[in-house]
Amino acid sequence: MEIFGTQQNLVTKIYRGDVNSISIMLPKNVVALGNSVDIVVRPISGACWKTSYDFTADGIVSKNASAMTKVGTDSNTMKYSITNNAVSFTYQNGESTNATNDSLIAVIYHRNFSEV
């Protein structure tokens, strides 16, 4: 855990495997108005995909499939979605079929709090 000003930053676990078959549960105690999460996926050497999500409610969150931002060279596409706090991914090639990968996934939680 790192604390910078009024923000606690925490990486809880690094996940590895086929990103198309991994689901990550966001803890309810972190899903709170004002908190946020960064998700970083490295499906192949030389490319990373990243997204940030600001929680707009307490407890349970859902989000329709959205594109992630690419850094590096990768001809495939990456999307993420959240359903009842479960984050899932879709990594596909140009033919809209799941692309082969052995991904590393990091979820970084940002918990905001007021100084006392």
Where are these regions (language model features)?
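Beta-strand-rich, repetitive solenoid scaffolds
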Residues: F4-G5, S52, S81
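Terminal beta-strand-rich extracellular "head" domains
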Residues: I44-S52, T56-N76
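Extracellular jelly-roll beta-sandwich "head" domains, especially the C-terminal globular C1q domain
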Residues: S66-V116
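Glycine-rich, low-complexity segments
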Residues: M1-S23, F113-V116
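Surface-exposed ligand/attachment interfaces on beta-rich extracellular proteins
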Residues: V11-G34, I44-W49
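Extracellular and analogous surface-interaction loops
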Residues: M25-A32, T56, Y109-N112
